[in-house]
Amino acid sequence: MAQYHYQALDAQGKKCRGTQEADSARQARQLLRERGLVPLSVDENRGDQQKSGSTGLSLRRKIRLSTSDLALLTRQLATLVAASMPLEEALDAVAKQSEKPHLSQLMAAVRSKVMEGHSLADAMKCFPGSFERLYCAMVAAGETSGHLDAVLNRLADYTEQRQQMRSRIQQAMIYPCVLTVVAIAVVSILLSVVVPKVVEQFIHMKQALPLSTRVLMGMSDAVRTFGPWMLLALLAGFMAFRVMLRQEKRRVSFHRRLLHLPLIGRIARGLNTARYARTLSILNASAVPLLQAMRISGDVMSNDYARHRLSLATDAVREGVSLHKALEQTALFPPMMRHMIASGERSGELDSMLERAADNQDREFSSQMTLALGLFEPLLVVSMAAVVLFIVLAILQPILQLNTLMSS
């Protein structure tokens, strides 16, 4: 998309100048007329071509819309479409309404594609960094069925639910993370600064030190001598782990082991199955074909092993296996969810049963997160208290011994 300098007459007949983004001079004139201007001259700004090209590239690949921004844009667009406003005008209104420049530019670019004759879904597919496959598939289904406003409202609900879930997880993790950092910092300062100064006095007295004090001195020396190297080793290990996870086989193997951990595995399985069921419910309610809906729903899974198992379930459904049987073969879904899906298949209300199953799984996920954090926080506090108590006792024991010797 290029930039064009223009001279035009406004509604009062006054001359005005400015720039207009468009794919061609003809489109620039058309956009100016839609703004109520009479174009006198439209010249391409060639000095900005390279900049414009890089902007287009960033729109296509680099911009990542937050779920809150995406939900807001979708809700605004759904409201305008439901009010029978033409799609081009609705997109223009959303672009002008946005206070964030990159969002306004994105919606203007989508509008430009629509005005070229593309469908809304195809226009959004041109910007995969901003609109994921699930979003584009639902918009396409809404355009085909003639219920675009209802589908957009459903999409807005979906993105808002995702944002709420992410916010709940982030808020739940704030306190344990802060507590962990504080605990590590306190113990590190005690071992590297406080303990050496106190123990130094005992060494000058040439007194036989108890075992706990000698252990504490060894720990303190290790922290001061090898502390930086230990940090470097941890950083190197973390980077090596990240590199290892880039290999698909090892990543799938790690994700498979993750799902089998006692408590973390249940939480990860609950989060992924709830996300899959909710996505499949929305796609099915939007008249997306089941196989396509299953493929897209599998793509939203954060666990690669679960994604692989669900791709096998999609193949099984393609071969004629019922949905609940195919999902049972994955060994990911709890029995209650499978029974609800089977009931939905028999009654013809699969989308509503999938939504109820996702709601149940969300509640179970929340309870599991609460349990995990409820166990972690007191364990961390007790562990920190035990370490501090050991340090205090290791310092007090020589002092008590010295007092005993002096009194005797």
Curated annotation (Swiss-Prot):
Its main location: membrane. Keywords: Calcium, Cell inner membrane, Cell membrane, Membrane, Metal-binding, Protein transport, Transmembrane, Transmembrane helix, Transport. The chain crosses the membrane at residues 174-194, 225-245, 380-400. Signal peptide: none annotated. GO terms for biological process: protein secretion by the type II secretion system. Residues 38-58 are annotated as: Disordered. Belongs to the GSP F family. PANTHER family: GENERAL SECRETION PATHWAY PROTEIN, TYPE II SECRETION SYSTEM PROTEIN F-RELATED. Component of the type II secretion system inner membrane complex required for the energy-dependent secretion of extracellular factors such as proteases and toxins from the periplasm. This is Type II secretion system protein F.
